[in-house]
Amino acid sequence: MTTLRWDGDDLVDFADGPDRWRLDGTVDIPSIRRSFGLPFDRGLVSPSGRFQAVYAERGTKALLLQGGEIVRELTRDPYPCAADTIDYPIALGALSDGREVVVHCPDHPYVLQIDDAQTGQRLTDGPRDQPDVYQSRLSISPDGRRLMTAGERYGNDEVMIFDLDLAVRDASALDGDGIMPLDAYCTDVAAACWLDSDRVVIATTDHEPLFDDADALGPRQLGVWSVSQSRWLHRATVGYPMGTLIACGSRVITLYGHPQLLDPITGDVIAEWPDVPIGTTQGSYEDTNFPTPIAALHPDRTRLAIAEPDAITILTLPSP
Protein backbone atom coordinates (compact mmCIF):
# COMPACT_ATOMS: atom_id res chain seq x y z
CA MET A 1 0.00 0.00 0.00
CA THR A 2 1.17 3.53 -0.70
CA THR A 3 -1.38 5.76 1.05
CA LEU A 4 -3.50 5.37 4.14
CA ARG A 5 -6.43 7.34 5.52
CA TRP A 6 -9.24 6.69 7.95
CA ASP A 7 -12.83 6.62 6.69
CA GLY A 8 -14.88 6.10 9.83
CA ASP A 9 -13.41 2.92 11.28
CA ASP A 10 -12.15 1.69 7.91
CA LEU A 11 -8.73 2.29 6.39
CA VAL A 12 -8.48 3.19 2.72
CA ASP A 13 -5.56 3.18 0.28
CA PHE A 14 -6.85 5.83 -2.12
CA ALA A 15 -3.89 5.53 -4.50
CA ASP A 16 -4.31 1.85 -5.19
CA GLY A 17 -7.63 0.23 -5.91
CA PRO A 18 -8.97 1.95 -3.86
CA ASP A 19 -8.64 -0.86 -1.32
CA ARG A 20 -10.53 -0.77 1.98
CA TRP A 21 -9.54 -2.58 5.18
CA ARG A 22 -12.09 -3.16 7.94
CA LEU A 23 -11.35 -3.68 11.62
CA ASP A 24 -12.70 -7.25 11.45
CA GLY A 25 -9.82 -8.11 9.13
CA THR A 26 -11.79 -8.20 5.88
CA VAL A 27 -10.58 -6.32 2.83
CA ASP A 28 -12.66 -4.85 0.03
CA ILE A 29 -10.69 -4.95 -3.22
CA PRO A 30 -12.54 -3.64 -6.28
CA SER A 31 -12.90 -6.07 -9.17
CA ILE A 32 -11.81 -3.31 -11.53
CA ARG A 33 -8.82 -1.63 -9.97
CA ARG A 34 -8.03 1.99 -10.63
CA SER A 35 -4.54 2.67 -11.95
CA PHE A 36 -2.98 6.08 -12.43
CA GLY A 37 -0.22 4.69 -14.64
CA LEU A 38 2.64 6.20 -12.64
CA PRO A 39 4.63 4.75 -9.70
CA PHE A 40 3.15 6.87 -6.91
CA ASP A 41 4.23 5.79 -3.44
CA ARG A 42 2.85 8.49 -1.13
CA GLY A 43 -0.32 10.50 -0.65
CA LEU A 44 -1.99 13.13 1.50
CA VAL A 45 -5.51 14.40 2.13
CA SER A 46 -6.68 17.98 2.65
CA PRO A 47 -8.04 18.75 6.14
CA SER A 48 -11.56 19.00 4.69
CA GLY A 49 -11.19 15.60 3.02
CA ARG A 50 -12.26 17.16 -0.27
CA PHE A 51 -8.93 16.86 -2.09
CA GLN A 52 -6.23 14.22 -2.15
CA ALA A 53 -2.80 14.11 -3.75
CA VAL A 54 -0.72 11.11 -4.77
CA TYR A 55 2.93 11.48 -5.68
CA ALA A 56 6.31 9.81 -5.90
CA GLU A 57 8.31 10.80 -2.82
CA ARG A 58 11.49 10.83 -4.91
CA GLY A 59 9.98 11.72 -8.26
CA THR A 60 8.67 14.67 -10.28
CA LYS A 61 5.00 13.77 -10.79
CA ALA A 62 1.87 14.10 -8.67
CA LEU A 63 -1.88 14.03 -9.19
CA LEU A 64 -4.46 16.18 -7.45
CA LEU A 65 -7.67 14.21 -6.89
CA GLN A 66 -11.20 15.04 -5.81
CA GLY A 67 -13.39 12.13 -4.80
CA GLY A 68 -10.86 9.79 -6.37
CA GLU A 69 -11.07 11.52 -9.75
CA ILE A 70 -8.15 13.38 -11.30
CA VAL A 71 -8.42 17.17 -11.08
CA ARG A 72 -5.06 17.79 -12.73
CA GLU A 73 -1.45 16.67 -12.90
CA LEU A 74 1.17 18.41 -10.80
CA THR A 75 4.92 18.41 -11.32
CA ARG A 76 8.01 19.60 -9.56
CA ASP A 77 10.94 21.03 -11.42
CA PRO A 78 13.38 18.24 -12.39
CA TYR A 79 16.31 20.30 -11.10
CA PRO A 80 19.53 18.27 -11.10
CA CYS A 81 19.66 16.01 -8.03
CA ALA A 82 16.60 17.53 -6.31
CA ALA A 83 14.07 14.85 -7.22
CA ASP A 84 16.54 12.08 -6.35
CA THR A 85 17.54 13.41 -2.94
CA ILE A 86 14.73 15.62 -1.56
CA ASP A 87 11.22 14.49 -0.60
CA TYR A 88 8.52 15.83 -2.91
CA PRO A 89 7.40 19.27 -1.61
CA ILE A 90 3.60 19.45 -1.42
CA ALA A 91 0.90 20.44 1.06
CA LEU A 92 -2.88 20.64 0.90
CA GLY A 93 -4.86 22.97 3.12
CA ALA A 94 -7.13 25.97 3.36
CA LEU A 95 -6.17 29.63 3.66
CA SER A 96 -7.66 31.73 6.44
CA ASP A 97 -10.39 32.87 4.01
CA GLY A 98 -11.43 29.26 3.38
CA ARG A 99 -9.93 28.79 -0.09
CA GLU A 100 -8.46 25.32 -0.46
CA VAL A 101 -4.96 25.41 -1.90
CA VAL A 102 -2.02 23.37 -3.07
CA VAL A 103 1.42 24.56 -1.99
CA HIS A 104 4.26 23.09 -4.04
CA CYS A 105 7.38 23.89 -6.09
CA PRO A 106 6.42 23.43 -9.76
CA ASP A 107 8.94 25.85 -11.27
CA HIS A 108 12.07 25.51 -9.14
CA PRO A 109 12.90 23.45 -6.03
CA TYR A 110 13.72 26.67 -4.13
CA VAL A 111 10.51 28.55 -5.01
CA LEU A 112 7.22 27.94 -3.20
CA GLN A 113 3.99 28.52 -5.09
CA ILE A 114 0.36 28.57 -3.94
CA ASP A 115 -2.40 27.44 -6.31
CA ASP A 116 -6.16 27.39 -5.86
CA ALA A 117 -6.92 23.67 -5.55
CA GLN A 118 -10.19 23.78 -7.47
CA THR A 119 -9.27 26.08 -10.36
CA GLY A 120 -5.49 25.78 -10.52
CA GLN A 121 -5.16 29.58 -10.43
CA ARG A 122 -1.70 30.66 -9.30
CA LEU A 123 -2.12 32.88 -6.22
CA THR A 124 1.55 33.83 -5.99
CA ASP A 125 2.20 35.39 -9.38
CA GLY A 126 4.95 37.95 -9.76
CA PRO A 127 8.75 38.20 -9.83
CA ARG A 128 10.45 35.85 -7.41
CA ASP A 129 13.88 35.33 -5.93
CA GLN A 130 15.43 31.89 -5.52
CA PRO A 131 16.74 31.38 -1.97
CA ASP A 132 19.25 28.54 -1.73
CA VAL A 133 16.84 26.23 0.09
CA TYR A 134 15.50 22.95 -1.23
CA GLN A 135 11.92 23.18 0.00
CA SER A 136 10.35 20.01 1.42
CA ARG A 137 8.06 18.62 4.14
CA LEU A 138 5.47 21.38 3.68
CA SER A 139 2.62 21.78 6.17
CA ILE A 140 -0.09 24.42 6.64
CA SER A 141 -1.18 25.52 10.11
CA PRO A 142 -4.71 24.47 11.16
CA ASP A 143 -5.98 28.06 10.85
CA GLY A 144 -4.49 28.42 7.34
CA ARG A 145 -2.42 31.47 8.24
CA ARG A 146 1.07 29.99 8.12
CA LEU A 147 3.20 27.54 6.18
CA MET A 148 6.04 25.51 7.66
CA THR A 149 8.75 23.91 5.56
CA ALA A 150 11.45 21.48 6.65
CA GLY A 151 13.94 21.47 3.80
CA GLU A 152 17.67 21.57 3.23
CA ARG A 153 20.23 24.35 2.73
CA TYR A 154 23.93 23.71 2.11
CA GLY A 155 23.65 20.23 3.63
CA ASN A 156 21.79 21.37 6.74
CA ASP A 157 18.18 20.44 7.54
CA GLU A 158 16.21 23.59 8.41
CA VAL A 159 12.73 24.70 9.41
CA MET A 160 11.16 27.90 8.10
CA ILE A 161 7.73 29.41 8.77
CA PHE A 162 5.95 31.80 6.39
CA ASP A 163 2.93 34.10 6.64
CA LEU A 164 0.39 32.83 4.09
CA ASP A 165 -1.97 35.80 4.46
CA LEU A 166 0.92 38.04 3.42
CA ALA A 167 2.13 35.65 0.70
CA VAL A 168 -1.12 35.77 -1.29
CA ARG A 169 -0.76 39.59 -1.35
CA ASP A 170 3.00 39.63 -1.92
CA ALA A 171 4.51 36.38 -3.18
CA SER A 172 8.02 37.52 -2.28
CA ALA A 173 7.09 36.83 1.37
CA LEU A 174 7.85 33.19 0.53
CA ASP A 175 11.36 33.97 -0.74
CA GLY A 176 13.18 34.94 2.44
CA ASP A 177 13.92 33.09 5.67
CA GLY A 178 10.38 33.45 6.97
CA ILE A 179 9.17 34.65 10.35
CA MET A 180 11.09 32.21 12.58
CA PRO A 181 14.69 33.28 13.29
CA LEU A 182 17.13 30.78 11.84
CA ASP A 183 19.27 31.06 14.98
CA ALA A 184 16.40 29.62 17.04
CA TYR A 185 18.10 26.23 16.55
CA CYS A 186 21.79 25.43 16.15
CA THR A 187 21.79 21.95 14.65
CA ASP A 188 20.01 19.88 12.00
CA VAL A 189 16.27 19.46 12.30
CA ALA A 190 15.04 15.85 12.27
CA ALA A 191 11.32 16.63 12.02
CA ALA A 192 8.66 19.22 12.81
CA CYS A 193 4.87 19.45 13.06
CA TRP A 194 2.13 21.89 14.01
CA LEU A 195 0.82 21.29 17.53
CA ASP A 196 -1.89 23.89 16.95
CA SER A 197 -2.22 27.11 14.94
CA ASP A 198 0.47 28.90 16.97
CA ARG A 199 2.80 26.24 18.35
CA VAL A 200 5.17 24.00 16.44
CA VAL A 201 7.13 21.06 17.77
CA ILE A 202 10.65 20.66 16.42
CA ALA A 203 12.97 17.69 16.96
CA THR A 204 16.70 17.87 16.27
CA THR A 205 19.33 15.29 15.36
CA ASP A 206 22.44 14.47 17.38
CA HIS A 207 24.68 16.35 14.91
CA GLU A 208 27.26 18.74 16.27
CA PRO A 209 25.95 22.30 16.81
CA LEU A 210 26.70 24.79 14.06
CA PHE A 211 27.21 27.55 16.62
CA ASP A 212 27.06 28.02 20.38
CA ASP A 213 23.95 29.66 21.79
CA ALA A 214 22.38 28.66 25.08
CA ASP A 215 19.03 30.03 23.91
CA ALA A 216 18.93 27.92 20.74
CA LEU A 217 17.49 24.43 20.36
CA GLY A 218 20.50 22.13 20.45
CA PRO A 219 21.36 18.56 19.47
CA ARG A 220 18.84 15.81 20.29
CA GLN A 221 16.32 18.19 21.78
CA LEU A 222 12.56 18.52 21.49
CA GLY A 223 11.22 22.07 21.49
CA VAL A 224 7.85 23.82 21.43
CA TRP A 225 8.03 27.15 19.58
CA SER A 226 5.38 29.88 19.71
CA VAL A 227 5.04 31.71 16.41
CA SER A 228 3.12 34.64 17.92
CA GLN A 229 5.64 35.10 20.75
CA SER A 230 8.68 34.21 18.62
CA ARG A 231 10.29 32.19 21.40
CA TRP A 232 10.71 28.71 22.79
CA LEU A 233 8.01 27.83 25.27
CA HIS A 234 9.68 24.54 26.18
CA ARG A 235 12.91 22.71 25.40
CA ALA A 236 13.87 19.24 26.54
CA THR A 237 16.95 17.11 25.94
CA VAL A 238 16.02 13.51 25.14
CA GLY A 239 17.93 10.25 25.15
CA TYR A 240 16.50 8.81 21.96
CA PRO A 241 16.61 9.69 18.24
CA MET A 242 13.49 11.18 16.65
CA GLY A 243 11.99 10.99 13.19
CA THR A 244 8.70 11.98 11.54
CA LEU A 245 6.42 13.83 14.00
CA ILE A 246 2.63 13.56 14.08
CA ALA A 247 0.63 15.90 16.33
CA CYS A 248 -1.83 14.11 18.61
CA GLY A 249 -3.67 16.75 20.62
CA SER A 250 -1.25 18.03 23.25
CA ARG A 251 1.13 15.14 22.54
CA VAL A 252 3.22 14.05 19.56
CA ILE A 253 4.07 10.73 17.96
CA THR A 254 7.58 10.19 16.63
CA LEU A 255 8.37 7.51 14.06
CA TYR A 256 11.99 6.42 14.24
CA GLY A 257 12.90 2.75 14.62
CA HIS A 258 9.54 2.19 16.27
CA PRO A 259 6.58 4.45 17.22
CA GLN A 260 6.73 6.48 20.43
CA LEU A 261 4.14 8.77 22.01
CA LEU A 262 5.84 11.78 23.59
CA ASP A 263 5.10 14.67 25.91
CA PRO A 264 6.56 17.56 23.87
CA ILE A 265 6.96 19.72 26.98
CA THR A 266 9.14 17.33 28.98
CA GLY A 267 10.31 14.94 26.26
CA ASP A 268 9.05 12.02 28.35
CA VAL A 269 8.04 8.85 26.51
CA ILE A 270 4.39 8.21 27.38
CA ALA A 271 4.13 4.96 25.42
CA GLU A 272 6.17 3.07 22.84
CA TRP A 273 5.81 0.02 20.64
CA PRO A 274 9.27 -1.54 20.10
CA ASP A 275 7.72 -4.59 18.42
CA VAL A 276 6.49 -2.42 15.52
CA PRO A 277 9.59 -1.75 13.40
CA ILE A 278 9.62 1.28 11.14
CA GLY A 279 12.30 3.20 9.27
CA THR A 280 14.95 5.53 10.62
CA THR A 281 14.31 8.60 8.49
CA GLN A 282 15.40 12.02 9.73
CA GLY A 283 14.96 15.17 7.68
CA SER A 284 13.93 15.34 4.04
CA TYR A 285 17.34 14.98 2.36
CA GLU A 286 19.17 11.71 1.71
CA ASP A 287 21.30 10.55 -1.21
CA THR A 288 19.60 7.18 -0.75
CA ASN A 289 15.88 7.32 -0.08
CA PHE A 290 14.78 5.89 3.26
CA PRO A 291 11.04 6.18 2.69
CA THR A 292 8.93 8.18 5.10
CA PRO A 293 6.74 5.82 7.17
CA ILE A 294 3.13 5.54 6.02
CA ALA A 295 0.92 6.24 9.03
CA ALA A 296 -2.54 7.65 9.72
CA LEU A 297 -3.85 9.02 13.01
CA HIS A 298 -7.58 8.47 13.55
CA PRO A 299 -9.46 11.79 13.84
CA ASP A 300 -10.43 10.95 17.43
CA ARG A 301 -6.70 10.51 18.25
CA THR A 302 -7.22 7.11 19.86
CA ARG A 303 -5.62 4.94 17.16
CA LEU A 304 -2.62 5.09 14.89
CA ALA A 305 -2.46 2.93 11.77
CA ILE A 306 0.96 2.05 10.36
CA ALA A 307 1.49 0.37 7.01
CA GLU A 308 3.94 -2.51 7.10
CA PRO A 309 5.09 -4.49 4.05
CA ASP A 310 2.39 -7.16 4.39
CA ALA A 311 -0.06 -5.79 6.92
CA ILE A 312 -1.50 -2.77 8.68
CA THR A 313 -0.78 -2.41 12.39
CA ILE A 314 -3.28 -0.44 14.47
CA LEU A 315 -1.98 0.94 17.75
CA THR A 316 -4.32 1.98 20.54
CA LEU A 317 -3.03 5.19 22.10
CA PRO A 318 -3.39 5.79 25.85
CA SER A 319 -5.80 8.52 26.91
CA PRO A 320 -4.30 11.93 27.81
Regions found by a protein language model. Give the residues of each.
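Short beta-strand elements that form the blades of beta-propeller/WD-repeat-like
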Residues: D9-R20, G49-E57, A62-L63, G98-P106, ...
